[in-house]
């Protein structure tokens, strides 16, 4: 005004609600972020999500947008997915120890087209119920990979993945796990991948 510059200030109000609904929403969002980080840390899963038709600008945002609504309360559930929809398979006899994950798998469709293709078995483990005497970890997830080549159309094949030292130390701090598994092959386009399955279980300490 009249060649002069005036500044006005006012006190801002940005109160954060502590209602149960708002707290749960924030907790769910933070846990969805951790879930997406864990899935996105596996290179083949990241590549599969990146080129999927799921809404989002990157693999990470696609994982987030797809999974946010699937969380049960504030925790990952069996309905959450570490891969977009793909070919189906059966999984049985899940076993997780502080050293490894083991599961028996069998394809349920497109067997002839998928036989003898070498897949990467991707495991993402959501950890819960930390032992009271163990240091709290800020990232309660572990990941592991292995190989799987379907050769039998009527029998289960065992797939086992071993944790590295960092993942093993993390798993040892918890007593329960939700194990997610999905298969990927990105050697040539179009990429081939399965849907994902999950099971909740106790961790066997060895």
Identify the role of each PLM range.
Residues 1-90:
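Long, polar/Ser/Thr-enriched low-complexity segments
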Residues 52-206:
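Charged linear interaction tracts used for macromolecular binding and regulation
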